[in-house]
Amino acid sequence: MSDSSYSDGAAAQSARGTAPRPEQAAPRLMLKGISKQYPAVRANDDVTLIVAPGEIHAVLGENGAGKSTLMKIIYGAVRPDAGEIQWEGETLEIASPAAARKLGIGMVFQHFSLFETLTVGENIALALDEPFDLKALAKRIREVSADYGLDIDPQRHVHSLTVGERQRVEIVRCLLQNPRLLIMDEPTSVLTPQAVRKLFATLRRLAAEGCSILYISHKLDEIQELCDTATVMRGGRVTGHVKPKEETHASLAQLMVGHSLPDYTRREHNPGEVLLDVKALSVTSDDPFGTSLDNVSFAVHAGEIFGIAGVSGNGQAELLSALSGEKRGASRQPADAIRICGKPAGRLGAGARRALGFGFVPEERLGRGAVPAMTLSENALLTAHRQKMVSSGWIRAGAMRAFAKRCIEAFDVRCGGAEALAQSLSGGNLQKYIVGREILQAPKVLVVAQPTWGVDVGAAAFIRQQLLDLSARGVAILVISEELEELFDICDRIAVLAGGRLSPVRATGATNAEEIGRWMAGLFGGREGTAPSAGHPAHV
């Protein structure tokens, strides 16, 4: 494919057309009576949805509400059992994603569909339905990445990318196809506040050119700022249509979950002794495209929640592996570079750190937090085997089931019981189980990565309250998250990791999202932190 095939923006705008006034426009997309039944659940039940040209339309609902199934039906990845799809006034069937793309429908999935052994450019090329030239495509990828504030190298192999960086690939891949309907599922979780504003400006420009946008997000402030209308789903059915700008956060949340959400219960912050102490930690990344840690120091006290913000790919993976015990020794750090409950732990393995009272919730739920094809009982064994689940080398299946049941009940995990497969749970329920599995072991120090990434507002509120309750019991908690709202909601102090360096530390009440956003771009300095050097670029 030639360069002009990718870079002719005027042609793309002409293809989308100028957005007509909503009252004059026939719907770009109309769904009537869409239903989809799976063996254990009715995912969609008589769903009707209308999206106009140039409209930014939100779809709201809890995990398991049927949003993802509906989007997959629109994109041709799932066939409905009943109902009618109209595209620009014509009744048709969307038999496959290729057919959807030919119509002009693009989708950014929350759960990624990338080949790990291929490069970014090769993965994007696979989504194109026409001949391509990898060199020209790489140039266009860089242009789009720069336009949208999505830092990604087309030559990198996907297996070397963090979760956040993989989402950037999905966004860029979709935008390269000049869609007439763009479906975006949680697209801003990897962006700084400044980059979110840039993305929103681009989406508004696309809408002004006539591109319709279906926007799925759990960030209610984003929906209120960006979206013209919203369809609310619960239990597979449409329960209402609203204009988000005329609603409050509380009313939108209540529409989603069917009841009002309780306010977070916080106690006065009276920090105790230091339970997690990191001093001058420098770790060389094993990944040639990774970000090495450079002289990172911080302390987390008993009864405190300490938050580290930052865009994915700035050393979070390296810090997490160093803290968890997965990476030790290779950094040639002294043993006391990491101290847990006063004990040198820098050269201890993961099991020895847990014996000191360390708990850990990884970023990836499926694959690291839980084995997809194993039951919840079996997954309990992964980190909680010290809870009398093993005796004289024998696994005690009854103890495993009892622990899993206790976790399910205590943390309101909605599933088919202790023998349900991990992969059968929604993201929110699996995350509640993984967090609960750690909390039930009564850790003294808990490190949590992305605790509510892709989780609905109900499950997110539950998880955050559990962390607040745990800190009130004297546990030292480190939360590494890209969700600024989350960090401001629950953290006592906050810092930013950018380019492998840690920013100054602030009391949460003494800073704001604008300052943290600048720090996420590497724009900080001073006695407690130094702006990233040329060798440690900040990924924004």
Regions from the language model: what does each represent?
Residues S2-V540:
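Glycine-rich phosphate-binding loops of nucleotide-dependent enzymes
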